[in-house]
Amino acid sequence: PSDTYFSNKEDLDASLTALYSVIASSQASNNLCGTNFLVGDDISTHPSSNKQPLREHDQFDVKDNNSWLSSMWEQRFKVIKAANFIINNAERTPEVSKDDIKVAIAQAHYWRAYSYFYLVTTWGRVPIMLKEEIDYNAPLKTEEEVYELILSDLKIAETDCPALYTKEPYGRNGMNIAVSEGAVKATMAYVYMCMAGWA
């Protein structure tokens, strides 16, 4: 539970590991993470294949019960739930530097924004969840409201994610493994392009 978690650095690190684990699952091949940019081509499916849910996207005729689309919805909200857990609770972790806490929260803000970006570009109006609990009766928000949250999250991530991580597990051999400032800026550019109708 969140009221007893985040009692040490191990808890903080474990919460990020859990977040990245959910992200990895949401990006796996058994999930339609490319729904909103692979449709209409020959990459995702072909007539003799067994991937009927993908074929519906290629034909721009997606049914309400499309299993891959449902999976994408569920996976994105799992990421949002894990990100909210960190955003709402990590700050109270004792005996951890403020910088480490800021970076952890910034990564969570990035992944929440990333997930909402997928949701809004696929469905348009979606519910906004800012707590760990998923409210299945939450009202749908306008696309403008969702984009406001996305940009707000990305600006926090841009401020607090370092350009280069120098310690494991976030950096290794001079390469970033976790979300960096550059990744945030690139995502923000894509978001602005979508908002302007160019992507």
PLM regions and their residue ranges:
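Polar, glycine-rich mid-to-C-terminal structural blocks
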Residues: 190, 196-199
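Conserved, well-structured interaction surfaces
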Residues: 9, 13, 17-27, 49-123, ...
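Bacterial Sec-dependent N-terminal signal peptides
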Residues: 1-10, 150, 189
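Beta-strand acidic-aromatic groove motif in beta-rich domains, primarily in extracellular
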Residues: 28-34
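Amphipathic alpha-helical protein-interaction segments enriched in hydrophobic
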Residues: 176-187
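Outer-membrane beta-barrel translocator domains and adjoining extracellular loop/strand segments
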Residues: 130-133
